[in-house]
A protein has these predicted regions:
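Internal catalytic domains of large membrane-associated glycosyltransferases
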Residues: 67-326, 339-340
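Catalytic core of nucleotide-sugar-dependent glycosyltransferases
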Residues: 329-342
Length: 342
């Protein structure tokens, strides 16, 4: 009998193993059973042609919706069509490690420039004790430059070496959410009226992001049972990145657009938003997972017995590619990023 860990590892290995077996056996069988391989390649080609047709159809559909959403004044729609938007509070989490002030400033400036009432927004700078000096410096600059731009700016430092966690964004976010739960309780806010947004620290959001998000949240039949997923772009440093990184970045965006049009298969990815009620019910982001952005969807799906979904947002958030000054290091960073996402 296999232990729980051994079964977990087996299931974890299977996707990668199947890919490598397909590649290796394709070469071996070309010599051993060439006729088999001819049939296999024909079927494989037909399969991929159908996948491309399917991909292009949903990509075109999403692109049309994306263009329409960008032309819409969501703030105006929110103010004139809704009566319940003013009781919503936005809590924006920005997890920090060793990023520079320029990166953090650009992200917070984009939130500050958003078309939404800033007194309804709380910015959370979630830093690490391992990089205490950088965290304190960044927090000081944020509070100095943006003191009058938001309802509040909260700094939370994640202690190092806590038990039963893996250091990373997931554990940092888990700790910050638990601390913010106390903050929200002190304010007396209803969890169902608090919308949590988790941005990567380099995220530049669309000016209409929070108005659009609020509109979707207020018009959704069951807003606490849904996450809200924007289109991920990697435009911040696109033209400073090697060609291969640019191609992969556009590929990720195309995949994201296709996924948005297929809501039945859509899960959260990268920067996104959700109800704080859902976060609490799911037990917060998993502190034993580094790449937590898609994991939280499955936590919510299980917590709500399958009654959970992702609502597409056809506006962009832009982030950095994983470029480095050295070309080879950029490729290694890209491989690690793709492996982490997988």
């Amino acid at each position: 009998m296999l232990s729980d860990y051994q079964r977990y590892r087996l299931y974890e290995i299977l996707p990668g193993l199947s890919i490598w077996l397909t590649l290796i056996l394709s070469i071996i069988l070309s010599f051993v059973r060439p006729l088999w391989m001819i049939y296999f390649i024909i079927l494989f080609d037909i399969y991929w042609v159908l996948k491309v047709v399917n991909f292009v159809f949903y990509l075109t559909l999403s692109w049309s919706r994306f263009r329409q959403a960008r032309k819409t004044d969501w703030e105006d729609k929110m103010r004139h069509e809704l009566t319940n938007w003013q009781d919503k509070h936005h809590v924006v989490f920005l997890t920090l490690y060793n990023e520079t002030w320029d990166v953090v400033k650009s992200a917070i400036q984009s939130v500050s420039d958003a078309a939404y009432e800033k007194d309804k927004m709380v910015i959370v700078i979630a830093g690490e004790e391992k990089k205490k000096e950088n965290y304190e410096s960044i927090l000081f600059n944020v509070q100095k430059e943006f003191v009058d731009c938001f309802g509040d700016i909260v700094g939370i430092m994640h202690p190092k070496n806590l038990e039963d966690e893996i250091p990373g964004k997931g554990s940092n976010l888990h700790y910050a959410e638990r601390q913010m739960q106390k903050y929200i309780d002190e304010k007396g806010w209803d969890y169902e009226r608090v919308i949590e947004t988790v941005f990567y620290i380099d995220t530049i959001c669309h000016p209409q992001y929070f108005s659009y998000l609020t509109y979707l949240y207020c018009t959704h039949p069951n807003p606490t049972k849904s996450s809200y997923q924007p289109v991920a772009l990697y435009n911040n440093n696109m033209w400073e990145s090697p060609a291969l990184l640019r191609i992969m970045a556009f590929g990720t965006t195309f995949w994201m657009l296709t996924s948005l049009a297929r809501q039945d298969a859509l899960v959260t990815f990268s920067s996104h938003s959700m109800s704080f009620r859902a976060v609490v019910d799911a037990g917060f982001h998993d502190k034993r997972i580094v790449s937590e952005d898609s994991r939280i969807f499955y936590q919510c799906l299980i917590a709500d017995d399958g009654n959970y979904e992702v609502t597409p947002m056809y506006v962009p958030v832009s982030m950095d590619t994983v470029r480095d000054d050295k070309w080879w290091t950029s490729l290694k960073n890209l491989y690690k990023q793709q492996r982490r996402w997988a």
